[in-house]
Amino acid sequence: MSRRVEFDMSHEDHTDRRRTNTFSSEEDGVPNEVADYLVYFSRMIDEQNVPEILTLYDQAFPDLTERFFRDRMWPDENVVERIIGPGNKLFIILYKELYYRQLYARNARGPLLVHRYESFMNYQELFSELLSSKDPIPLSLPNVWLWDIIDEFVYQFQAFCLYKANPGKRNADEVEDLINIEENQNAWNIYPVLNILYSLLSKSQIVEQLKALKEKRNPDSVADEFGQSDLYFKLGYFALIGLLRTHVLLGDYHQALKTVQYVDIDPKGIYNTVPTCLVTLHYFVGFSHLMMRNYGEATKMFVNCLLYIQRTKTVQSQQPSKKNFQYDVIGKTWDQLFYLLAICLAVQPQRIDESIASQLAERCGERMMHMANGNVDEFRNAFSTGCPKFLSPTTVVYEGVNQSKEPLLRQTQSFLEGIESQMALPVLRGYLKLYTTLPTKKLASFMDVDEENYDSFLGKLLTYKMIVNELGKEAGPSTVDDDEPQTDIDFYVDRDMINIADTKVARHVGEHFLRHIQKLQEVQDVLKRLDSAGQKP
């Protein structure tokens, strides 16, 4: 039984509002409770009452959907306009954004082409209102709704690209309409999608502001009235992460990381207020590092994200029933992260959080053992399970074979080429752990390397050394609070002799607690000074 959400409305107020329009509960088939909700929702948008908007969006909408619209759609825009009255263009646009999002969520095969087209036109109208205004729009929305707008926009673009590459997703009547859309390039084309996201960045000056913050400068010094607007700043921030995701789906990992180079991946970031945003950021940054063979940084991102999901698992378990109209990022990504983490640790073993390590061993222990022994099929299966749904924005198939999986096959091949070039590394590491000194010729014989391939073998040895060294290079904030090495082995080559050092050290639990006791004492001292300052007359 879903919990009903009550609205603090004046009966006289909302009745008067509905007397001025042509709404009829019997004719339009809309329950009075839903009509009251829409009137109140519209009023809260006008008043910019963010806490109340959050309740109406986050709790009331799913609650009413569960009770009244399990088997049918919410009323269309014309009925809603008769309920709330004319002159509420912005609310109608926002309502339609929710309407189409629910339409996508409840259709396993995806909505009809006409609904995909109408949804894009509604997004275009929304962003046009925001971007073409001479002054910042007087609109305040909760962080989670702002993120959901950007996230759903990118998701629907991805869904359209997969739809037009798969003839099995549409009926015969839609082919002609799709031909017309593609010829005119007026819906879900890559260029307007990227243009909208980059325009949000430009309008909000988000990159300049984040760069200023990173350089310890005042962000207001590089921002105009749009950049200083809370609405535009947050939309620009979330658009950065939307662009990160888009570039990864297109296979441009360097540009993806460049897009978020000034985003401070810190627990106190804006994205932390929206769990799905935090998970999206860490997943796609980590995946970009993995595809660029920076396995150490990828591991940090994946472990950080898994720890966050683990800590908030109780809350997140309530999300599907609470937001049944949303794309459940967290639930799906939880499994994907383990497969990607298994790949990273099979190629480049390192110490990670013990709770995550135990779950990883339970889920993927046997798979990792096969990968460490050079089983290419295990790498392929883990990658296919953990990767996102890649897309090709220019591929259109009007009839014939489904080509929506072609981008996945290309990215899988690219990934495996990188893995195959390093396939010997896990085996190499296994031999090095057995010795403190080892002649290069002897190691080569262990690995069945003949004289002709000896030079290339030395190259692989140097490659492994570079991977070990790479762990010391911080591309982001450290996930550990000590200086312990992340790998359990290090070595150097002196002429024809390999010198190996076991870098695995015992964890100094006592020192860990002492450090945090000191930090706690410092915080308490600051609080005492603030308290004494506040009590002064």
Curated annotation (Swiss-Prot):
Residues 1-28 are annotated as: Disordered. It comes from the Eukaryota. One of its GO terms (cellular component) is eukaryotic translation initiation factor 3 complex. InterPro entries: eIF3l (IPR019382), PCI_dom (IPR000717). One of its GO terms (biological process) is formation of cytoplasmic translation initiation complex. Its main location: cytoplasm. Residues 297-485 form the PCI domain. It is found in: Cytoplasm. Keywords: Cytoplasm, Initiation factor, Protein biosynthesis. GO terms for molecular function: translation initiation factor activity. Residues 1-19 have a biased composition (Basic and acidic residues). HAMAP family: eIF3l. Component of the eukaryotic translation initiation factor 3 (eIF-3) complex. Component of the eukaryotic translation initiation factor 3 (eIF-3) complex, which is involved in protein synthesis of a specialized repertoire of mRNAs and, together with other initiation factors, stimulates binding of mRNA and methionyl-tRNAi to the 40S ribosome. The eIF-3 complex specifically targets and initiates translation of a subset of mRNAs involved in cell proliferation. Belongs to the eIF-3 subunit L family. This is Eukaryotic translation initiation factor 3 subunit L. It comes from Caenorhabditis briggsae. The lineage of its organism: Eukaryota, Metazoa, Ecdysozoa, Nematoda, Chromadorea.
